Amino acid sequence: QNTSDVASQPAHDALMARYGSEGNGDTDSADVDLAAALAAADRAELADTIASAGLYNQKSKTLIRLAERVVAEYGSAAAFDSFVTEEDPAAVRSTLLDMKGVGPKTADCVLLFSGGQAGVFPVDTHVHRIYRRLGVAPPDADHEGVREVLEREVPAAKCGFAHTASIQFGREYCTARKPACLEGPEACPLYDLCDRVGVDEETSEVVDPAEATVDD
């Protein structure tokens, strides 16, 4: 959570190499349980393993705490995976949000990518900014408000692609302080579809959509 893909992927790969089946070469991979391995992990060693993700001391504590809960309540990572994929999505989301260290975006990503719940649209800072700036969601909508709009308007089968594409669009075009539209209509592929809420092209002033003055 709160880590870019560029930083999180190497950390994930290192974690799996040390604590997953790759890091347990003497053991049948079917017998390796990631939750049990993380629950028993040395915190300093785990922190060093995921250092590329940033905030590694805090995240290592969170991972161990979550792994301990999974083992205590479900018995194994596999059993928890079954819970995520087979139980009612609302119940799964509620359970995830009850876990300290898991926020709405992380919970929704688990539902979408691990649980196979196609109609879930995770909202990170990019998604929250883009769809209010576009005028798709109300300018004062919080993360949950934006999620509700997107899950209502976007076809379920497209939510996963739209989520990842939106993040890329936010990084390349619809940035927080200097969106591409300030360079002119040709600079942004969605220029003609966007209300540009909070963006003043004449002064180049950019504010959060919630702070923008909307003309009647």
Q: What is the role of each PLM region?
A:
Residues 1-215:
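Catalytic cores of DNA base-excision repair glycosylases
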